């Protein structure tokens, strides 16, 4: 699908650069407030930088993953092509 993640690169801190199958690219920021429940391991800044792509999905070696379609929609709709994952 067009929202499949093709590439992820660690930028710094809690930011990742992502590129999708249709060429859209942007930045994903994972705020500490998001890292609760199953995502609690992402409180570890070092783990954030170990993101990989597996079959079009952004994931981590411990099995955590993020829905690529939601990430794509949020990056596309933001003029800065940035998606900030936060708990409200």
Where in the sequence are the language-model features?
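Motif-centric detector for short Cys/His coordination patterns
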Residues: 1-88
